[in-house]
Amino acid sequence: MKPHKHAMASARKYGGKWQDYEEIHEFFDHSKSAHPDVRHRALLHSAWGIYLAERVFGRTFENSDGRIMAVRDVAEDHVFQDMGFIPTASKWLDAMDMRPWMGGPIKKRVYVAKGGPEHVD
C-alpha cells in the first residue's frame, strides 16, 4: 500500500486529516528508494522499525482534531497493513543467507617461525 493510502486509513481510524499521518507512513516506505521491490520492507517493516519511528517522530503527536496520538499505534498499523503481522528484525535476518562480506574485511595474519613467515587465512 502507498503511504498516502496508509495515511487515509489512519485518518479514518483515528480522526484528523490524512496529512497528519503521511510523514510517518512515508518514513516506512523510504527504503523503496534503496531497493524498489518488497524486500525493502526488511529494513523498517518490523518491531525495530516501529521503535525507530518513535525515535524519529517522538512518542506522541497531536493530530488536526487536537487528539494526542501515539506514533507507535500509527507505525504498528502501517506494518500490520503491509505484512499481516509485525515481524521482528530477527525474523527478517533469519531469512537472509550469510555472506563472507557481512563480517567485514578479512585480515591475514603472518606468523614468523624458525623456517620463515607463514601465511594463515
Question: What are these language model-derived features?
Answer:
Residues 1-121:
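N-terminal membrane-targeting hydrophobic helices
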